[in-house]
Amino acid sequence: MSLEVGKQALDFLVANSGNRRNLEVDFFGGEPTMNFDVVKELVRYGRSLEGPHNKNFRFTLTTNGVLLDDDIMEFANREMANVVLSIDGRKEVNDYMRPTRNGKGSYDLIVPKFRKFAELRNQTNYYVRGTFTHHNLDFSEDVLHLADLGFKQISVEPVVAPPEEPYAIREEDLPKLLEEYDKLAKEMIKREKEGRGFNFFHFMIDLTQGPCVAKRLSGCGSGTEYLAVTPWGDLYPCHQFVGMDEFKLGDVWHGVQAEEIRDEFKL
């Protein structure tokens, strides 16, 4: 993404935010550390918009960690409200799905950086995020592996993939996955009692009130509270739809033009 497109995206966000003061921007890939000079300039530009428009930007960085260094960590710890560190769990699981360009795994390269990053953030305002697939249905082992590495904020989520892909989750996998969630819950309770507790994103639910009415109506907020911006400035309901022409909403210069598509996400 160019600086010009990024600035226009922030201008679009401010112009369409109404009376909402807190605005969220996630630098998401691709890999934003490959274009980090633009990330830094966009953060500075966003800060310059806060006072005149009575806004507060909450920036998030999502990274695979390969290019992560001390300078990026220092900037992120100063400017990013949250960081998301991509790792799939055990070494063999992560390296199978996340090889580097030379075909080698990324686990040994990123784990020391991620552990340092988490400690620099005092084990808050971050999470390590993995994806489980048909190849690692025993995903609770990956969650516990990340906890054993010292991470306190963990999210491991099911892959979203076309059904023909060999790594896609299948209907026959569901009983095993449900067992894994039960297994994980029991182990988390045990560790909490032992003083070794950690947070698992999908278990962080308000058991007394549950989802609020607005959330039940709008779901994840795609197309209404959330938009994805491509490097060329095109707008989509979320990153899952990027590249699908039938879901293109418009662009950051002309705004949302396909209102009929956006309205589908309000139902």
Which residues fall in each region the model found?
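Radical SAM enzyme [4Fe-4S]-AdoMet core and its adjacent flexible, acidic
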Residues: 92, 96-108, 115, 119-226, ...
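Short, acidic, Ser/Thr-enriched surface-loop or helix-capping motifs
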Residues: 230
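Cysteine-centered iron-sulfur cluster-binding motifs in ferredoxin-type domains/subunits
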Residues: 31-34, 223
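Catalytic cores of large soluble enzymes that bind and process phosphate-bearing ligands
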Residues: 1, 34, 176
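Membrane-interface junctions of multi-pass transporters
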Residues: 217-218, 243-267
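Radical SAM/AdoMet-radical enzyme domain recognition
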Residues: 3-28, 35-159
